[in-house]
C-alpha cells in the first residue's frame, strides 16, 4: 500500500510531491484563476448578446468580437498551461523569448504593448483613463482579467527564476542575475496585461463614444 501523502502537499508530476505553497502550485493556481475569470466574462457577454438582439447591429458585432477575442485569450492561457506542464515550447514564440510568428487579436507581442501605451492614438481613449463603475459590468471584468494576468506573470517569474537557479546551482536569493527558464512563456505573459488593456480600451471606444476622444469602428 502506498504511503498517504501529508495534507500540506499536492501531487504535480511524476517527480513526486511539492508543498501547496510551492511556486509551481502558485503559478498554476493563478493561471487557473485567470481562465476562470475569462469564462465568467464570456458568460456575461452571452447575456449581453441576448439583450442586444433587435438593437443596433453595431452593438452585437462589438460584443461578438470581444467574445471571440476572449476565447483566443483563454485558448492561449490553456496553451501556456500545457506548455509548462509538458515542457514543450509555446507555439509561435522562440525559446529565447523573441516574438516569432505569435499573434493575439491580430497583433504581435510588441504591437500589443504599443497599442496599450498609445490607447488614445489607436482607440481614442485618453491616456491613464482610470477604471470606473459607470463603464459597465463587462469593462469591470476585463479590468479584473488584466489584474489577474499580472498575478500570473508575477508567479511565473518567481517559478522560472527559481527553476533556473536550482539548475545552475546559483543562490536564488543572491543579487547576481539568473537567466530564467521558459523565456517563451515569460515573454508572452509580460504582454498579456497589455492585451487585456487593449480589450478594455476598444470596448470603451466602441460602446462608450462619450468617453472616447475619437471615433473607432469595428
PLM segments and residue spans:
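Phosphate/pyrophosphate-binding loop motifs in nucleotide- or prenyl diphosphate-using proteins
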Residues: 1-218
Amino acid at each position: 500500500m502506498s504511503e498517504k501523502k501529508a495534507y500540506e502537499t499536492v501531487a504535480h508530476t511524476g517527480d513526486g510531491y511539492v508543498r501547496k505553497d510551492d511556486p509551481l502550485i502558485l503559478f498554476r493556481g493563478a493561471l487557473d484563476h485567470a481562465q476562470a475569470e475569462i469564462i465568467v466574462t464570456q458568460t456575461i457577454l452571452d447575456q449581453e448578446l441576448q439583450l442586444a438582439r433587435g438593437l443596433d447591429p453595431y452593438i452585437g458585432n462589438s460584443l461578438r468580437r470581444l467574445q471571440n477575442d476572449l476565447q483566443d485569450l483563454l485558448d492561449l492561457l490553456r496553451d501556456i498551461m500545457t506548455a509548462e506542464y509538458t515542457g514543450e515550447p509555446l507555439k509561435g514564440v522562440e525559446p529565447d523569448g523573441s516574438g516569432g510568428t505569435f499573434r493575439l487579436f491580430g497583433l504581435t507581442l510588441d504591437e500589443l504593448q504599443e497599442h496599450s501605451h498609445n490607447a488614445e492614438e489607436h482607440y481614442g481613449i485618453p491616456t491613464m483613463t482610470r477604471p470606473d463603475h459607470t463603464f459597465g459590468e463587462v469593462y469591470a471584468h476585463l479590468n479584473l482579467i488584466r489584474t489577474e494576468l499580472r498575478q500570473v506573470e508575477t508567479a511565473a517569474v518567481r517559478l522560472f527564476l527559481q527553476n533556473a537557479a536550482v539548475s545552475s546551482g546559483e543562490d536564488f536569493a543572491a543579487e547576481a542575475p539568473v537567466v530564467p527558464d521558459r523565456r517563451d512563456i515569460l515573454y508572452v505573459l509580460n504582454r498579456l496585461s497589455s492585451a487585456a488593456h487593449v480589450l478594455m480600451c476598444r470596448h470603451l471606444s466602441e460602446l462608450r463614444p462619450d468617453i472616447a476622444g475619437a471615433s473607432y469602428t469595428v
